[in-house]
């Protein structure tokens, strides 16, 4: 159900547009079909390996690896959230996971001899894709997210990949500036929008060609399904991504797609509470002497704040900081009562982890990535401060 173009400016305030459509209204109605008497508002999942197809094969639904009506509803919904004002009609392609979505963009648009520019401080699995690209004969260049450092590597590039805010360091780059420079150099631009979600940042409006995300995290927000998606500026780009999905079979199950669509209805409510919780937590952590390296784009003193405030509509649910050493960090995590020691982020239940336990990220042993959930703010902040007090006692 297309419900108009949005020019609102805040998840927290439920930003709207010229016809009065706010983020919450859009999220609740996104992707719904026109009402049909005696049918549910959101049709249930369609489980089908093949579809009845007499005669010539016409229409989108032929075989379950190609298309599914449950995907269609979800894809339309995400496109409405990612690019409500896109005049040419953005298209979304959903995948079995975020890594499947990332791989689809990179591997469908880069071939031997091409140049791809990646961040060197992005998601932990991105180096695996770098290795695969290089094995295929693609030249990969890397630079940090901060300071728009990737600008210096665009000569001859085929594709520029941005991750902003970066995970787990929370650096931010100027998407519009980088996109303009990349397009001038003849490169396509993809932005990993996982941390911001479509309500916090709209990469296509900032000039990107692709907005890519793991829907496992903030988009669906319950920590109970894996999903990825790519929203493309136009049909031609989407066709290449969709073809790659068909080739490798990286499709979401109908149940996962349906659960994801159902979860979108609460996206604005979840995002607003979680973003507010993250900022309150960051402000409380700023007063703690044992905390160093505190990062959250919403803090006025954060190095990324000025850039983030110019392109983000809210600042996300993640806070990162460093405690004195590994033992101190582990004591802190063990002392928390309202926060699960778990990886990933974006869920309604707060999680935190010592990120260095995985290896691969250039972080200190005491580095904590904290994902603020939807708990009452005073309860969450009190639990974290109590945990810090216990950890400090040794």
Spans of features found by a protein language model:
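PLP-dependent enzyme catalytic core of the Aspartate aminotransferase-like
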Residues: 2, 86, 130, 140-141, ...
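N-terminal "arm"/small-domain region of PLP-dependent enzymes with the aminotransferase-like
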Residues: 2-9, 16-70, 74-77, 371
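C-terminal core of ALDH-fold dehydrogenases
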Residues: 27-42, 327-360, 366
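Conserved PLP-enzyme active-site core in the AAT-like
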Residues: 29, 81, 86-290, 295
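Short loop segments at secondary-structure junctions
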Residues: 50-51, 232-237, 264, 322-327
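A common structural junction motif
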Residues: 248-249, 336-346, 387-394
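Short, well-ordered beta-strand elements within core beta-sheets of diverse protein domains
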Residues: 262-269, 316-324, 368-373
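Conserved small-domain helix->loop->beta segment predominantly found in fold-type I
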Residues: 279-337, 354-363
